[in-house]
Regions:
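Recognition helices and adjacent regulatory flanks at domain boundaries
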Residues: 127, 172-173, 177-265
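Intrinsically disordered, low-complexity protein-interaction/activation regions
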Residues: 1-192, 196, 201-202, 259-265
Length: 265
């Protein structure tokens, strides 16, 4: 007889920190304070390797670790995390060996930030291959996860790095979504998505290029040229550079099609 299908454990590091398995779950209210959230998130991000105790302590407290008995304090945090995780699944635990901690999850566990990166890889691969119909789903997954806050209200260098990584995932996923919308002739949607890209990363010219294509494709060449003028001014004012040849080539084609230019802003 076939074994009954089982939902995998799901660990959400974005939004409210939560772990769930079927109808069992725990969220950050059962994690030992801000330090517990930081410990679980760091161990989850680094779960492919053992994390030295002093490295985890730095991730948990940054420069403000408890004087003297920090190892005892960290051990207490990990013990509480271990108990909460085992309440979901005996295979979920934090192992200790050779002065290191390591988060151990079932082989089929789903971690949201990992899923976002995997989905982005799939989406970009589909777009590169011209398979836009199959790119939308994974791109939407990546963009949705990456738009959620990571450890809101908590700051540290490693947290800032992960937020930057998620921001990049979100921008690239939005670009994939815009590419799909363009390929499907959904120009207003492509323009909306491209505007999100340039709002998040105003110096990323691919966002401006796709915005120009979307506006022009929707019949608004003058607005597309105004987008180019905005890009040109931004780059000149902030970076002292001119747009890339690819961006200028789009503007040149638009000017030729409209029989002139657009007022600079």
């Amino acid at each position: 007889m076939a074994k009954p299908w089982k939902n995998p454990l799901r660990l959400y590091l974005t939004g409210r920190l939560t772990a769930e398995l079927g109808d069992r779950r725990f969220d950050e209210r059962r994690v030992p304070g801000r330090q517990g959230r930081r410990a679980l998130a760091y161990l989850a991000l680094e779960r492919a390797r053992p994390v030295p105790i002093d490295e985890l302590a730095e991730a948990v407290w940054s420069t403000a670790s408890p004087s003297g008995a920090w190892e005892t304090a960290l051990s207490a945090i990990v013990s509480k995390l271990r108990a909460s995780l085992r309440g979901l699944d005996p295979l979920c635990t934090v192992t200790t060996a050779a002065g290191c901690y390591q988060l151990s999850l079932p082989h089929d566990a789903w971690v949201d930030v990992e899923a976002a990166r995997d989905a982005l890889d799939q989406a970009e691969g589909h777009v590169r291959a011209g398979h836009t119909k199959t790119a939308w789903g994974p791109a939407n997954v990546a963009a949705s996860i990456a738009a959620r806050p990571f450890l809101a209200g908590v700051d540290a260098e490693w947290i800032a790095r992960e937020r930057a990584t998620l921001r990049d995932v979100r921008v690239r996923a939005l670009e994939c979504l815009a590419a799909v919308a363009l390929a499907n002739g959904e120009h207003p949607l492509a323009a909306q998505l491209s505007r999100e890209v340039v709002e998040l990363e105003p110096f990323r010219e691919t966002g401006w290029q796709r915005l120009m294509h979307a506006l022009a494709g929707g019949g608004n060449r003058a607005e597309a040229l105004r987008a180019y003028a905005q890009c040109e001014k931004l780059l000149a004012d902030e970076l002292g550079v001119t747009p890339a040849p690819e961006t200028e080539a789009i503007a040149k084609r638009l000017r030729a099609a409209t029989g002139g230019g657009v007022r600079r802003i």
